[in-house]
Swiss-Prot record:
PTM: Oxidation of Met-45 to form methionine sulfoxide promotes actin filament depolymerization. Methionine sulfoxide is produced stereospecifically, but it is not known whether the (S)-S-oxide or the (R)-S-oxide is produced.
Propeptide residues according to the Swiss-Prot or TrEMBL record: 1-2
GO MF annotations, alphabetized: ATP binding; hydrolase activity
Subcellular localization, as worded in the UniProt entry: Cytoplasm, Cytoskeleton
Gene3D superfamilies according to UniProt: 3.30.420.40, Actin, Chain A, domain 4
InterPro entries: Actin, Actin/actin-like_CS, Actin_CS, ATPase_NBD
Reaction equations catalysed: ATP + H2O = ADP + phosphate + H(+)
Extra remark: There are at least 4 actin isoforms expressed during artemia development.
Modified residues (Methionine sulfoxide): 45, 48
Name recorded for this polypeptide: Actin, clone 403
Amino acid sequence: MCDDEVAALVVDNGSGMCKAGFAGDDAPRAVFPSIVGRPRHQGVMVGMGQKDSYVGDEAQSKRGILTLKYPIEHGIVTNWDDMEKIWHHTFYNELRVAPEEHPVLLTEAPLNPKANREKMTQIMFETFNTPAMYVAIQAVLSLYASGRTTGIVLDSGDGVSHTVPIYEGYALPHAILRLDLAGRDLTDYLMKILTERGYSFTTTAEREIVRDIKEKLCYVALDFEQEMATAASSTSLEKSYELPDGQVITIGNERFRCPEALFQPSFLGMESCGIHETTYNSIMKCDVDIRKDLYANTVLSGGTTMYPGIADRMQKEITALAPSTMKIKIIAPPERKYSVWIGGSILASLSTFQQMWISKQEYDESGPSIVHRKCF
């Protein structure tokens, strides 16, 4: 008897990447881009078995002939047909399981429209016939993964960033702040500033190349002005990158100008606060008695917090905003790219969690709105 037969499935559907696997594992089995690609041209070869859509890595590898679409934008599902394709691909092609045999734990961004989680619930029970499911808030799972029950999580992925204060395992909804500035916006910004250097990137396929440059070469400066001066006076910060066609490009101050937009959204023409100020504002919306615990347990999570230097910069910026005697600690776990998934894996394998699942029977009795009562 194989253990996977009763294991819950944990699926973290991000705006950029989908992470999926089995509860109890320490890392996701499948990580692939949340992309659905459709051919740009009419097929001419008969009998090649061309598909009308491709999902994930296959869409990525054929990106030259496809138009790529992300069904999740800013953490909200905007195209349910494509989303269903991604889930189908997750269960049948990546994990190779029958969803009707496993409970499924899904994740969601805080402050999402209610209709979003209702529709998720409906598709799981009606399309995939799952025996049970649950929808958890992403940031809460990240905190679980760091081994805490109290702290403030700055979760920044590809589509959305948010700060969620959590006390004794409960998210404090009045103090959650959301910032629609994340990895995808930084990729677009890098495309723009590379154009100023004379390199042109425009198509959906070329955007993926720029995303790779961003992930490999960008970092956060501790002191932006000083770093700009260093970049102007020497070539010590320049790095080169080889494009798929063999051309080599050089990038200098773009390496830290790109992620600087997280701290200065005005770079993108946005009037919002940076991630440091958003985190501070979120803490200030909480009860005065628990702020000390939040300052001392500030947890970073998500792919957009993977830039070298981001934790030191957060430490510096929040120290400047907070009361001078306050102890501030920024926790940046090395596996934070996957900490939402890891937290889901921990939660779904707890014995105390087993009564939390929404069962098929409960769904049949109450309909999709059951999700608001059972998942908070």
